[in-house]
Amino acid sequence: MALEWAGSPSRLLSGIVNGRSQAACVQAVDEQTHQRRVCGNQSLTPALSLTIFQAMNAYIGRVVDLLEPNNNHFDNVSLEEARQRVLSGSPETVRAIEGSFALLACQGQMVRMARSMDRPMRYFLAKREDGPTLIVADRIDSLYAWLKSEGLEGQFHPSYTRMVPAHHVVELHLIGCPDPAPQYTRFFTPVRNRFSTDLDEIGRAYIGALADELAKWLRHVPEREPVGVCFSGGIDSGAVFLATYHVMGKLGLNLSRLKAFTLSLGDGPDLRQAREFLDRLGLGLFLEPIEAELSSLDAVETVRVVEDYKPLDVEAASMVLALGRGIRARYPQWKYLLDGDGGDENLKDYPIEENPELTIRSVVNNLMLYQEGWGVGKFKHSLTYSGGLSRSYTRTYAATRHHGFDGFSPFTRPGVIEVAEGIPFTELTGMSVPKLYALKGEVVARGIKALTGLDMPVFPKRRFQHGATRVEQLRRQMPDREAELRNEFLAMYS
C-alpha cells in the first residue's frame, strides 16, 4: 500500500499574520481529503485577507511512497531510525547506516531520499491543480501504474523519471512551479590510494571486508533456509563462494545448506570452469548445474524486467533470468541468492579497449568510475539512469526479484568498495593495462588464501553471458543493437 504525505501550508502563514491575529488564523489540511480550510477568522483587514487567501492557494506538496519497507535490510538501525538519519541530511549519519536500503523522509515541503548501491530508487514529479505530487518507487512501471490509476498517465514519459544515484542524499522542495531542482549531497567518499603496494596486505583487507559483510548478511538468513551462490568459477563468484563457505563454517552453520548454481546453455565454458574450480579444492559436491535452452533467452522480456536497454546489461540480465528460472523450477521455495556483481567495478577489471571514451588514466584516476559513472553534476551523467553500477545494478536486482529471490552481493557494500578505492592502482600498474587486468586475480587470490588457507584457482576474465554460451551463439539469439533495445523499451509506454 502506498504511503502518502501532504505538506501543510500552515507554515506559510507564519510571519504573515501579525502577532495579534496569528493565533486566530490557522490553516489545516484534512488528512483524508487533503482539503484546506482556514478556521477562526473573525476580524481581518482586506489587505490581510488577501495575503491569507494567497497563502491558502499555495501549493500542497504530496508524496506517494511505493517502496516496500520489507525490502530494506539493516544491520545496525531500525527502519524508523534509518529514515530519521536520511531526514537529517547529514552525510556522516547516513553513511553510518549499514545494510541495503532505499529510503525517503519528509518534513514540511522538503523531501530527502537516499539508497544503497543494491537498491534502485526512482521518482517522478506529477503536476496537479493543488500542487505537485512526488511518486517514489523502485521501478519505472510502478510509477506509471500509479499515475495511470490517478488519470495522470498523460504526463508520463520514462525519460522524465529520475533515479536516485547511489551514495548520495537527494533533496527536493515541493514548491510547485517552477519545478524543483534536486540537490545532491555525497554521503560516501572513500579515501583513495591509502594502502601500500603490499598485495598481501591489500588482499587481506579486501577479502576480510568481504567476509565481514557476508557474516552480517548470513545472520539475517533463517537457519534452515538454503543459500545459493550464482557461480561461474570466475574470480568474483569464486571469492564469494569460498568466503561464504568459510564464514558459514566459522559461524557453525550447516554447510549442506550451501549450493553453487552454474548456468549452462549447452555449449558455454562456464560449467567446465566451475567444475574444475571446485574439484581442485575438493568441493565439487557443492556444484549444481542449471541447464537452459538458448532459445529461452528473450531480449524484449529482459528489457521489460530491467527497464534499461544497454546491450551488455541486457545480456547479463538475461543470464540471471535464465538461472533464476531454472532454480525456481527445481526449488519452488528457494529464496536467498548470493552473487559477485560489483567485483569487476571495484578492481577496475573491464576491457578498456571496448569503450572508446575510456583510457587507463580515466579508469584509475576517477573516484568510483565504474560504480557511479562520470559522477553527479558531470556532463555525461544521466538524470534518468545515474551511471555505472548505480544504473546497471538492475541487471541483478530486478532479475532476481522477478523470480522471487532475495539477492545480495557483498561487493556492493561501502566497506568493501572503500578498501578497493584505497588500492594504489597507479603505483601497482605503472599505467599498464595488462598489469591492471592481472591485479584483480592477485589481490583476490591472496586474500582468499589469507582468510581460508585455500589456493583459489584464477581463470582469465570472461563476462557472465560469454560463459553460459559461446559468444557467436549468443549473438544470433540477442543482437548487439542498442537502438533496437531502446525502441523496445520506449514502446512499452507508447
Residue ranges and their predicted role:
Residues A2-L3, S14, Q109-R112, V191-T452, ...:
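ATP-dependent adenylate-handling active sites, centered on carboxylate activation for C-N bond formation
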Residues A2-R20, C25-A28, H34-I290:
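Cysteine-centered catalytic environments shared across enzyme families
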Residues E482-E484:
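Non-catalytic structural connector segments
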